[in-house]
Amino acid sequence: NDGALPSEPFEGGDRRQVLQVLSAMVGGGALAAVSHSAEAKDASELPPPKRALTGRNEAGKSVFKSFDVTSKVVEIDANPGLTFYELYRTEGVPALTGLEPDPMLPGTKGFPGPGGTIFRLISYPPKRPEGYKPPPGVTLESGLKELSDKLPGMGDHFDRSAPGMHTTDTIDYGVVVRGEMTLELDDGKMVHLHQGDCIVQNGTRHRW
């Protein structure tokens, strides 16, 4: 990269993109960001996020290393519409030399290591209608296995006795970018979240 500006400018009026940038500044944990309400269209309607990755050149000047749609898009076949956009991760405290290779090139991870972070955008499918049946052959175990196969270890954290409930050893910073979603905790209390609402999940058992 010669340090020139990307050929396609940022869309300043797009609230979703602005919130993605703010979320990246917060860092830490596994970031849940996007949802759709019961009236929302299929998750495929959401444009894949573009990622501007910065670094430094050999002269120490700041440059754009890339500006494109992330190649790490994970779709869960057992839950059509559930899509993870893996944007960036760190392992431990980064040196910030600006010369580091893109950490997303090797593959995906379910969670960061000690002191690390993961920046991801999650698109949840709309609320299922009453009587909805999963795709043929899909069971709870097969669905969680697929989740762990595609995002290593993630399916292991789900409670088999209470579908959807899960606990992770992370602090998750979340922003509802579009749509609405409901967060439920152990005591049965729920909070209904709207566009722009934020969540700090302190390693607590929960479901969406």
Range-by-range predicted roles:
Residues S123-P125, H166-T182:
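Short, conserved beta-strand element in jelly-roll/cupin
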Residues D187-N202:
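Short acidic-glycine-tyrosine-enriched beta hairpin
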